[in-house]
Amino acid sequence: MTQPSSNKLTLLDWLDTQEDNMVTLLRDLVNIDSNSFDKAGVDRVADRLGEFFDEQSIPFETIPIATHGDGMRAVVAGGNGNRPILLCGHRDTVFPTGEVEKRPFEVRDGKAYGPGVADMKPGLVINAFILAAFNKFGGHPNPLVGLFTGDEEIGSPTSQDVIIAEAKKARLAFNSEPGRPSGNIVTKRKGGIFCHCDIYGVAAHSGGFF
């Protein structure tokens, strides 16, 4: 078995010291209402991530989107021209605006609670700290690209093209959605479909004779 290099050990040691900072970032993200149709809220999540990237000296750009949350792309260079590794995540949630006021972020008995605390604001924190760690210590053989979109919960109608374009350039991609209760991770999906169904029938009562 190949032993990790010393810089990787340093990287992991640093991550071990960042738990409080991770929880702080998670708290800040969860305490922003960011329903898929709340563009202002979804973009405020990007603003908070942008503050983190500025603190870590990680360059990022905004991809303007008119109707839903803007796209956000952060890059940690390296890899001598190798194809990048893509770290994906979405900033929107299914919860209505105002949900944060009802149940803001809190930690009870070692568990975090709040809107988006599973799907998927912790995943944004994971990706952000992965980028920060490799930006700080290096050792990555490929460039790293963090892509943070704003409309996944409604099928990514405005960010789909952005995701596809980044995925085509990447060597591989990790999407930091939550795993299963067993600890297993999901490696593929069957896909999804939106459809409109017209149902025709005859009105009746179950107790009637028809």
Language-model-detected regions and their locations in the chain:
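Conserved strand-to-helix beginnings and helix N-cap segments that scaffold or border functional pockets
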Residues: 42, 99, 124, 156-160, ...
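Acidic/histidine-rich catalytic neighborhood of metal-dependent amide-processing enzymes
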Residues: 120-194
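Acidic-enriched catalytic cores of C-N bond-cleaving enzymes acting on peptides and small amides
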Residues: 187, 206-210
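Acidic/His- and Gly-rich active-site-bordering loop/insert found
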Residues: 2-115, 135-140
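Glycine/serine-rich anion-binding loops at beta->alpha junctions
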Residues: 95, 111-126, 205
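Small-molecule pocket liners
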Residues: 103, 193-196
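Fold-independent oxyanion-binding glycine-rich loops
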Residues: 89-91, 109, 117, 149-151, ...
